[in-house]
Structures are given as C-alpha cells and as structure tokens.
C-alpha cells in the first residue's frame, strides 16, 4: 500500500501505534491505465506522466496487543460508491473512520464519518467525533510543525517510531 495509506495512519493514531503481528492484504491496479474509469483520480498531471500506484487495497491487521484493524481504500474499483474506510477494534473501544463519495473522486462531495464505540456503566455508547473542516487536510500545519521541530520549538506531530510502525 503506497498511495492509500492515509486511513491506516489515522487509525494507528487513534489506536496508539501498536506493533503489527500479522498482516493480510491485497492491492489492486486493475483500472490504473483506464483514464475513463470512475472519477478524476489517478490521471497524471502531465501528458507523459506515469500512473504506477494501486487503485485499491483491502486488508486486515492483527497487533501484538490483540487489537485488530480492517481497511478498504480505493479510488477506482467496481462498487456502488467509492469509499475509503478503516475499522478498528480493541478490548476497551472500537471505531470507524469513513469517507463516502457522492461523486467518485471529488472531495467536495464526500461525507466523512468518525465514530468511537465504548461501554460506559454497562451500556454501549457510540460517539461521533466531529472536527472542523480543513481544506488543506493538515498539510500546512504539518509543514509548520516540521520547521518548528527542527528549530527545537515543538515536538514532532509524528515520531520516527510511529512512521516505522506504519510502514510495517
């Protein structure tokens, strides 16, 4: 998984970056050369550009902590609506992060969900996590943090150990 790693990264953040124990996954690039297939994604910015990333990935990860994570991410596959989602489960909580597109590939048509599932006082409690929209998807803040980290002003948003866990 190269291009579609973002949902796994987000789920690992919520899970506390546990160490992976087993990974079962499959990537697909069935539609990568078909420029007319569903939506504007995957099209090179220049005429001679290369399209050499996956178009979909599905997988299941078990961690040494006993937590599990399943994911479905794509920008082009045979389905009703494009969906990018990850579900995670542990002993104290579970959750789901999902982006469902009304028009494939167009972020402005997407519906975002982020939910946390817990037990409180013997009752199931489902919480929707609502955040302010961020048009740059955190890119400006991440770049600022990188500079501030080098300057010694801030701690990094992501550590090298977290990046290594993500790549495993």
Each language-model region and where it sits:
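C-terminal helix-rich "cap/oligomerization" subdomain common to oxidoreductases
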Residues: 64, 130, 145-168
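Rossmann-like dinucleotide-binding domain that binds NAD(P)(H)
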Residues: 1-68, 73-80, 161
């Amino acid at each position: 998984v190269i291009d579609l790693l973002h949902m796994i990264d987000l789920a690992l953040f919520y899970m506390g970056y546990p160490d992976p124990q087993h990974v079962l996954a499959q990537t697909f690039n069935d539609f990568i050369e078909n420029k007319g297939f569903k939506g504007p994604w995957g099209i090179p910015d220049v005429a001679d550009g290369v399209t050499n990333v996956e178009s979909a990935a599905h997988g299941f990860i078990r961690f040494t902590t006993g937590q599990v994570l399943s994911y479905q991410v794509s920008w082009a596959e045979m389905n009703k609506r494009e969906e990018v989602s990850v579900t995670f489960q542990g002993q104290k909580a579970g959750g789901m992060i999902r982006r469902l597109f009304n028009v494939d590939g167009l972020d402005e048509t997407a519906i975002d969900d982020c939910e946390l599932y817990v037990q409180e006082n013997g009752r199931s409690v489902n919480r929707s996590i609502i955040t302010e929209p961020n048009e740059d998807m955190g890119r400006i803040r991440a770049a600022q943090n990188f500079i501030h980290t080098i300057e010694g002003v801030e701690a990094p948003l992501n550590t090298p150990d977290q990046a290594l866990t993500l790549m495993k």
